[in-house]
């Protein structure tokens, strides 16, 4: 993976153009931007190929029933775009690609003169298989809990089994981060997450095991972006609550380890660019052709409940249903993530 960094400001129209030279043997591009200015938000306006053709613009994906990427939505002080997402979005032709980042205020009005830092990463095409490197951290003193560590180790095997048919394997290395067991809100992000991500290699996805997330026992896990960034940023991580996955007694049994493994794969899938095949409004779907566009809860649970990216686990008082399936189009999105190499 080749990493390049810039700093700059948005122009009078609220845009900052990032030009990335893609080599002939490279097939994926990840651009992430962030700003430290208060009341400023980042999103991707558009991406253009070396001939100047618009490959994607936000207007085509903002107010439609399908979701391609979270990059176009101004939801925080950082944003990331991985390109291409689908087969029809590619290939990534060699030459200079231009990604236009937009800076806006909390009224969604463009702002000029906003300072931002940008990282662009490209990868050499790995073929039909690849590896996602994971920097795994335990918050607080959780690494000293042997039963928890053993449960996480088993859950990682479940995650690996879910991803194995996609051709993507995972390589896990344990790292240390300075975060308390109650993890900060990852959707809001912040300096604590930036500092944590700075402890990892620029090619690794940071995954942090905490007890709770922002005080909640109802959140199984969160991804800081769809997709997320590999370099340090205010949301460049995946957060996992072991307590939410372990159930009321806080002790992992076999079914709860399965749930934890499904959660790890689900949130890492978001980080690599996968969206839910259907949102729980039953009125919005992913942009992939081989997932059902069901329109009612009962139909969606029949069609998609075993899918790893279904928006929620299906549980009764004794156990949760396995959610380990991924379609070929979903698998291809994983393989196109720049962090898979």
Task: Report the location of each language-model feature.
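The catalytic-center signature of Zn2+-dependent metalloproteases
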Residues: 250-332
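Beta-sandwich interaction modules
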Residues: 20, 65-93
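Exposed low-complexity, polar/acidic, P/S/T/G-rich flexible segments that act as propeptides
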Residues: 105-142
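Noncatalytic modules at the cell exterior or secretory-pathway interfaces
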Residues: 26-29, 84-108
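Active-site-proximal segments of metallohydrolase catalytic domains
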Residues: 167-255
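Acidic, Ser/Thr/Pro-rich low-complexity intrinsically disordered segments
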Residues: 5-63
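Stable alpha-helical elements in mature extracytoplasmic
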Residues: 148-155, 189, 260-264, 330-333
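A short alpha-helix/helix-coil micro-patch that ends at or immediately precedes a cysteine
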Residues: 139, 144-173
């Amino acid at each position: 993976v080749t990493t390049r960094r810039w700093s700059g400001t948005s122009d009078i129209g609220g845009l900052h153009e990032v030009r990335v030279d893609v080599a002939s043997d490279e097939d994926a591009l990840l651009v992430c931007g962030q700003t430290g200015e208060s009341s400023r938000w980042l999103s991707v306006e558009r991406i253009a190929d070396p001939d100047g053709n618009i490959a994607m613009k936000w207007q085509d994906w903002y107010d439609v029933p399908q979701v391609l990427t979270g990059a176009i939505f101004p939801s925080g002080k950082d944003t990331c775009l991985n390109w291409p997402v689908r087969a029809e979005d590619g290939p990534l032709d060699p030459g200079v690609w231009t990604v236009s980042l937009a800076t806006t205020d909390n009224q969604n009005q463009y702002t000029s003169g906003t300072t931002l830092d940008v990282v662009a990463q490209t990868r050499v095409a790995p073929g039909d298989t690849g590896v996602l490197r994971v920097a795994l951290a335990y918050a607080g003193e959780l690494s000293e809990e042997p039963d928890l560590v053993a449960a996480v180790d088993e859950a990682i095997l479940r995650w690996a089994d879910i991803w194995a048919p996609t051709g993507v394997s995972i390589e896990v290395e344990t790292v240390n981060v300075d975060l308390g067991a109650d993890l900060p809100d990852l959707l809001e992000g912040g300096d604590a997450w930036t500092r944590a991500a700075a402890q990892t290699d620029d090619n690794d996805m940071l995954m942090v095991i905490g007890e709770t997330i922002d005080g909640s026992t109802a959140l199984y896990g969160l991804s800081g972006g769809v997709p997320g960034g590999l370099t340090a940023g205010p949301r460049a991580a995946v957060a996992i609550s072991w307590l939410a996955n372990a159930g009321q007694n806080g002790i992992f049994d076999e079914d709860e380890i399965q749930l934890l493994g499904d959660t790890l794969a689900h949130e890492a899938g978001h980080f690599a660019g996968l969206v839910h095949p259907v949102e729980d409004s039953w009125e919005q779907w992913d942009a992939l052709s081989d997932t059902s566009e069901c329109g009612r809860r009962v139909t969606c649970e029949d069609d998609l409940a075993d899918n790893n990216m279904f928006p929620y686990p299906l549980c009764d008082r004794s156990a949760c249903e396995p959610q380990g399936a991924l379609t070929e189009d979903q698998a291809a999105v994983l393989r196109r993530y720049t962090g898979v190499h």
